[in-house]
Amino acid sequence: MIRVKISNFIKNNINKIRDLGIKLIIAAIIIIIATIILSTNRNHKTNSDNYEKESYKPTETIIQGASVKKEQYEKDNNIINKFLEYCNNKDISKAYELLSMDCKKELYPTIEDFKKYYYETIFDKERTYNLQAWISDKKYTVYKIRYTNNMLSTGLYNEDDVYQDYITLNKKSNKEEIFIGNLVYCEELNIITKTKEIEAIVIKKKVYVSDEEYEIKIKNNTDKIILMDTLQNNKNIRLLTNDKTEYGAYTNSIFMKDLLVEPWQTGTISIKFKKNLSSDKKSKVIQFSNIIKDYITYKENSQNYNDVISIQINVED
């Protein structure tokens, strides 16, 4: 009797039973697939986290030099973290005080300059940072720093809202001070080069992560206006190294008026060259190979003018 009832029930509801079975099978398949995906993602995240932990070694220099000692790194990181906290807390004056004297003088002469050109560009919101030793030698350590928005305070991360800079600390300094804005160090030189027409004094060298800049005084020892270069190309002002490698000047940042020197007068020019800090080539001379001896005559007939001279200015003793 019971078997008959069951048989009749199945016959009367065969379609419903079939649909239910299909739904259960589909549900089981979905659960299995979801479990596999979750497991894979969990393993991937674990592997990724482990890889990042293993690969991120902030004391190992990426470009040049020995790894930074743990004690030195912790000391440097404390100073950099202090700078960041001052900026996040809008304590601009204390952040500015942490800049080295040379950094202030060359890049941010006033606190308003620092506020406008650095602070307001980066710290429009609370930031955190990622630090990596970049270049290290006996005198200094350069760190690459990436400023990102603070996810703990915003809950968001935006790859487009990341700022990169290089921060340098002088190992020989007993002060808590930093170089920012890619500037690594400044060095007084006062090296003199003389010719019959020109006396040149290389006053100072400013070294950046990717460039070298020289401040030069040019004395005109003639009775004509001298033009140090026509700026028609970037091949006539070159930085030469010990192995004769040549680096061109950024002539687009030089004004013609700065290259004009009146008779018996002295002018000052700053010239920057694209020479990386990591290069092991030693800078030797700056070569001016197209100096116009008589600018007035040149202006009158530049096409036929040919009274030019050259000079190699020493940048090392």
Please identify what each model-predicted range represents.
Residues 216-225:
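Asparagine-centered strand-capping/turn motif at beta-strand->loop junctions
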Residues 224-233:
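Short, hydrophobic/aromatic beta-strand segments
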Residues 136-217, 260-261, 268-317:
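Exposed beta-sheet edge and beta->alpha loop/turn motif
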Residues 42-85, 89:
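Short, low-complexity N-terminal intrinsically disordered segments enriched in polar/charged residues
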Residues 247-258:
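Solvent-exposed serine/threonine-rich low-complexity stretches and specific carbohydrate-binding patches
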Residues 1-20:
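N-terminal Lys/Arg-rich, disordered targeting/topogenic segments
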Residues 93-145, 150, 237-238, 243-249:
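Short solvent-exposed beta->alpha transition segments
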Residues 23-37:
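Hydrophobic membrane-insertion alpha-helices, especially the h-region
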